[in-house]
């Protein structure tokens, strides 16, 4: 069947050569999907690739080699990748990967795929077995001159009318917005393994992408706005930072409006959220400081306006608007990573900040001005709302620290002791706004020099007066200073610090927002 497809490709190219100048490149590739039933796609056939102006298109193949048995995984189109430039054959070069992958340039170049082992080894080529001539083949050769031309004309007319979006197996009749700055993950083998969390906008899966574990946040179609918002935040220049969740891709999965799922693929962190970790673990003084310092560093960077960020362009100031311990993830060394930017808002000079509804976020972590509905819709006001929530998360850390000479209680959420696990908006307004209550700071915490100073910082974060709250950058510097002063002290110095904690020089409140 190779000859008919080649002839058809030549006819199509000759008809379109005149009209294709200045337009995006097109490519035709062999298509195959081993998971076609699960992903609700065709199992095999041809895929027509359509790219953007000045972008090159390739074909690819991926497969497994289990004890000499070749298991084809996927074939199809691949977007502009310099590793594929000018490759006429599909050749995988990695040594013994779990999944082999190759890409090439040229129509149907992924029909044959090859693994070229380390130098000196034999080249192993995998090629579809030849098939005996069939009646269908004979008919194809006989009818090709007339039928092929008719088919090309019909295809050209149909494509002109429908304008299929590039790489799209899904059409949900919307403007998809700017594409995310990442390769198309949908063409790589991705397997969902287990659900790790469920939230307001869907569920989070642990998944395997090639040889790595990733997190896949799946939104139902009705929560499209949250998916789009988070994708746009991740696509903002300068969002690559050690203390911000690493973004990999955003995709639409499914084949009809009723079955579409919206996927957000990010790095996976096995320790989970800070909430989950504190529930099961008591932390040391150094662990508390490390989490607090890296968490405040991440929020400080998010809040910062960077005119020219590492050559990527202008990074605007961003308010999180749903800062809480559940949205702080932990790396293996307990470095904090901020996540869940579905409610975040950007503040770009000369542009409105977008959707800035007042009462958004998690009720328990809402600042007094949010509970009152008395928000000043300016950048600094939103950053101060984040800082109130930061104070509550720091309190959660202190409540599970064993540094103080006293009992460590079971983990509790902020205000859980005062108004339970499911407080109403009215209860929070009464406690936080009218009574101006805050989570209890235990007496024995104040007997530890470091915790005592940290409690002062916490109180300045959740101050009822929003303008008096510290900035995230100031909190980062405070925690670093406290950590160094305590860790460098001798036992005798610790005794004197306990009696003179109020005289310790903290960073001045001029560092507040």
UniProtKB/Swiss-Prot annotation:
The keyword Metal-binding applies. Transmembrane serine/threonine kinase activin type-2 receptor forming an activin receptor complex with activin type-1 serine/threonine kinase receptors (ACVR1, ACVR1B or ACVR1c). Transduces the activin signal from the cell surface to the cytoplasm and is thus regulating many physiological and pathological processes including neuronal differentiation and neuronal survival, hair follicle development and cycling, FSH production by the pituitary gland, wound healing, extracellular matrix production, immunosuppression and carcinogenesis. InterPro entries: Activin_recp (IPR000472), Kinase-like_dom_sf (IPR011009), Prot_kinase_dom (IPR000719), Ser/Thr_kinase_AS (IPR008271), Snake_toxin-like_sf (IPR045860), TGFB_receptor (IPR000333). Residues 190-481 form the Protein kinase domain. One of its GO terms (molecular function) is activin receptor activity. Residues 19-137 are extracellular. Phosphorylated. Constitutive phosphorylation is in part catalyzed by its own kinase activity. It is a single-pass type I membrane protein. Residues 492-513 are annotated as: Interaction with DYNLT1. GO terms for cellular component: activin receptor complex; cytoplasm; plasma membrane; protein-containing complex; receptor complex. It is found in: Cell membrane. The chain crosses the membrane at residues 138-158. Its EC number is 2.7.11.30. It is an enzyme of class 2 (transferase). This is Activin receptor type-2B. It comes from the Eukaryota. Keywords: ATP-binding, Cell membrane, Disulfide bond, Glycoprotein, Kinase, Magnesium, Manganese, Membrane, Metal-binding, Nucleotide-binding, Phosphoprotein, Receptor, Serine/threonine-protein kinase, Signal, Transferase, Transmembrane, Transmembrane helix. GO terms for biological process: activin receptor signaling pathway; adrenal gland development; anterior/posterior pattern specification; artery development; blood vessel remodeling; BMP signaling pathway; cellular response to growth factor stimulus; determination of left/right symmetry. Residues 159-513 are cytoplasmic. The active site is at 322 (proton acceptor). The gene is Acvr2b. Belongs to the protein kinase superfamily. TKL Ser/Thr protein kinase family. TGFB receptor subfamily.
């Amino acid at each position: 069947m190779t000859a008919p497809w080649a002839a058809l490709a030549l006819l199509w190219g000759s008809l379109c050569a005149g009209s294709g100048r200045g337009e995006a490149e097109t490519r035709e590739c062999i298509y195959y999907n081993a998971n076609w039933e699960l992903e609700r796609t065709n199992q095999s056939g041809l895929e027509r690739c359509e790219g953007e102006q000045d972008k090159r298109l390739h074909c690819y193949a991926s497969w497994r080699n289990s004890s000499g048995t070749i298991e084809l995984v996927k074939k199809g189109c691949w977007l502009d990748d310099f590793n594929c430039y000018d490759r006429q054959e599909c050749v995988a070069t990695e040594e013994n990967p779990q999944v082999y992958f190759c890409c090439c340039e040229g129509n149907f170049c992924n029909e044959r795929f090859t693994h070229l082992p380390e130098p000196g080894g034999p080249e192993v080529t995998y090629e579809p077995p030849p098939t005996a001539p069939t009646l269908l083949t004979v008919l194809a050769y006989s009818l090709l001159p007339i039928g092929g031309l008719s088919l090309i004309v019909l295809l050209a007319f149909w494509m002109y009318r429908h304008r299929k979006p590039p790489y799209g197996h899904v059409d949900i009749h919307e403007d998809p917005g700017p594409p995310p700055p990442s390769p198309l993950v949908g063409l790589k083998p991705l397997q969902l393994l287990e659900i790790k969390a469920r939230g307001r906008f869907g569920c989070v899966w642990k998944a395997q992408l090639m040889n790595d574990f990733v997190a896949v946040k799946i939104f139902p179609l009705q929560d499209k706005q949250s998916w789009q918002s988070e994708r746009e935040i991740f696509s903002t220049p300068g969002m690559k930072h050690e203390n911000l969740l690493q973004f990999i891709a955003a995709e639409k999965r499914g084949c009809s409006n009723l079955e579409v799922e919206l996927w957000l693929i990010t790095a996976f962190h096995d320790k989970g959220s800070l909430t989950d970790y504190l529930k099961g673990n008591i932390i040391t003084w150094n662990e508390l400081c490390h989490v607090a310092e890296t968490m405040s560093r991440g929020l400080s960077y998010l809040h910062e306006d960077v005119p020219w960020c590492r050559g990527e362009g202008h990074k605007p100031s961003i308010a999180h608007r749903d800062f809480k311990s559940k949205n702080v993830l932990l790396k293996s060394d307990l470095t904090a990573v901020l996540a869940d930017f579905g409610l975040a808002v950007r503040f770009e000079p000369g542009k409105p900040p977008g959707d800035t509804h007042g009462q958004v976020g998690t009720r328990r972590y809402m600042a007094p001005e949010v509970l009152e509905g008395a928000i000043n819709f300016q950048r600094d006001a939103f950053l101060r709302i984040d800082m109130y929530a930061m104070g509550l998360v720091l309190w959660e850390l202190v409540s599970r620290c064993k540094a103080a000479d006293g009992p460590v209680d079971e983990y509790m959420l902020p205000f859980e002791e005062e108004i339970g696990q499911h407080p109403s908006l009215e209860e929070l307004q009464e406690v936080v706004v009218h009574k101006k209550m805050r989570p209890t700071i235990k007496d024995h915490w104040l007997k530890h020099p470091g915790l005592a100073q940290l409690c002062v910082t916490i109180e300045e974060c959740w101050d009822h007066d929003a303008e008096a709250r510290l900035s995230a950058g100031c909190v980062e510097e405070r925690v670093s200073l406290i950590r160094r002063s305590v860790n460098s002290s001798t036992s005798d110095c610790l005794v004197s610090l306990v009696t003179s904690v109020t005289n310790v020089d903290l960073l001045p409140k001029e560092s507040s927002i």
